[in-house]
């Protein structure tokens, strides 16, 4: 394919990428809400405030990755994939413990993980791969 023509092909963002960005953002928002409720029940005072600050920093990093993915930065989707591949097996025992102590908490955690998996699958579809490979 001619490099001069390549940028015009598939220049608009594929629906799969748009949906992936939406699903990933939803997973972070759902996870943040769950975390705030957990922290509110377990902590108070300075420990609660400090935990909320760390949560906000974590969310900022997550949304930075999502915005970079939406901006067609291939490195962002690869880094996010690597983090998911590393994190998901490590989090699985926690999901089991959460399900035993609270079905609601465990279910929400699993829903967050499923949303992230769906988002990653959408980011690596054929149309998504082509979109990330084309030059801006």
Model-derived features with residue positions:
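Topology signature of small-to-medium multi-pass alpha-helical membrane proteins
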Residues: 1-136
């Amino acid at each position: 394919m001619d490099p001069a023509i390549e940028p015009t092909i598939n220049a608009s963002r594929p629906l799969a990428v748009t949906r992936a960005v939406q699903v990933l953002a939803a997973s972070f928002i759902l996870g943040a809400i769950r975390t705030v409720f957990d922290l509110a029940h377990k902590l108070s005072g300075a420990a609660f405030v400090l935990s909320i600050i760390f949560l906000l920093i974590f969310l900022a990093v997550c949304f930075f990755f999502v915005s970079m993915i939406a901006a067609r930065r291939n490195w962002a989707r690869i880094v996010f994939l690597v983090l998911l591949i590393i994190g998901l097996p490590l989090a699985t025992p926690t999901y089991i413990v959460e399900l035993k102590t609270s079905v609601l908490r465990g279910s929400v955690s699993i829903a967050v993980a499923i949303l992230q998996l769906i988002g990653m699958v959408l980011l690596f579809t054929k149309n998504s791969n082509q979109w990330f490979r084309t030059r801006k």
